[in-house]
């Protein structure tokens, strides 16, 4: 039973006891205190970003991973000069690299702003409109489902049970005649 330390008005140092079983206001005080010491709280707005691996969830592995060999290929028997091939490779690679950088410099921040607004609106609508509508619908449909269930058990179950008993006695004999 130990806890945090505090100093009273006379300057005496005291420890605040933390009970093993907790109390009605803070159950499991000791366990909670130990967890808080071990865990670091991370905020989504202040987390560090990885400048080396910019696609940690591999969203674009199959989509935009386009290299020179994926676009331009010369089959056997149809080859250009080696110098032309090397220059084409360099031109393609450098152009793609710098044009992407130019486009991301010009449109990256505005597009991030637009997508941030879009996903904020989408999250807002999902939290404050879609989920409450679905919950409301599920609550309202319960009375209909009960009436429907009574109807099925009263009329449909006996009917299909009788039909099943009728057809359960049908026997088919297959004979092969020579």
UniProtKB/Swiss-Prot annotation:
Segments for region (Interaction with CAVIN3): 82-94
GO-annotated biological processes: caveola assembly; cell differentiation; negative regulation of endothelial cell proliferation; receptor internalization; regulation of cytosolic calcium ion concentration; T cell costimulation
Residue positions, PTM Phosphotyrosine: 6, 14, 25
Molecular function terms from GO: molecular adaptor activity; oxysterol binding; protein kinase binding; transmembrane transporter binding
Covalent link Glycyl lysine isopeptide (Lys-Gly) (interchain with G-Cter in ubiquitin), residues: 5, 26, 30, 39, 47, 57
Principal location listed in the UniProt entry: Golgi
Modified positions (N6-acetyllysine) in chain numbering: 5
Modified residues (N-acetylserine): 2
Intramembrane spans: 105-125
Alphabetical keyword list: Acetylation, Cell membrane, Golgi apparatus, Isopeptide bond, Lipoprotein, Membrane, Palmitate, Phosphoprotein, Ubl conjugation
Family listed: Belongs to the caveolin family.
Protein name: Caveolin-1
Organism encoding this protein: Sus scrofa (Pig)
């Amino acid at each position: 039973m130990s806890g945090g330390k505090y100093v009273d008005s006379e300057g005496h140092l005291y420890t605040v006891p933390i009970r093993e079983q907790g109390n009605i206001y803070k159950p499991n005080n000791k366990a909670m205190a130990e967890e808080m010491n071990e865990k670091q709280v991370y905020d989504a707005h202040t987390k560090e970003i990885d400048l080396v691996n910019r696609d940690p969830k591999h969203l674009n592995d199959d989509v935009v991973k386009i290299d020179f060999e994926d676009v331009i290929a010369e089959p056997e028997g149809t080859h250009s000069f080696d110098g032309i091939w090397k220059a084409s490779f360099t031109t393609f690679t450098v152009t793609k690299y710098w044009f992407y950088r130019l486009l991301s410099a010009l449109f990256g921040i505005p597009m991030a702003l637009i997508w941030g607004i879009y996903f904020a609106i989408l999250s807002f609508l999902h939290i404050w409109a879609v989920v409450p509508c679905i919950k409301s619908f599920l609550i309202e449909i319960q009375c209909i489902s009960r009436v429907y269930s009574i109807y099925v058990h009263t009329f449909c179950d006996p009917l299909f049970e009788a039909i099943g008993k009728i057809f359960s006695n049908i026997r088919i004999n297959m004979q092969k005649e020579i």
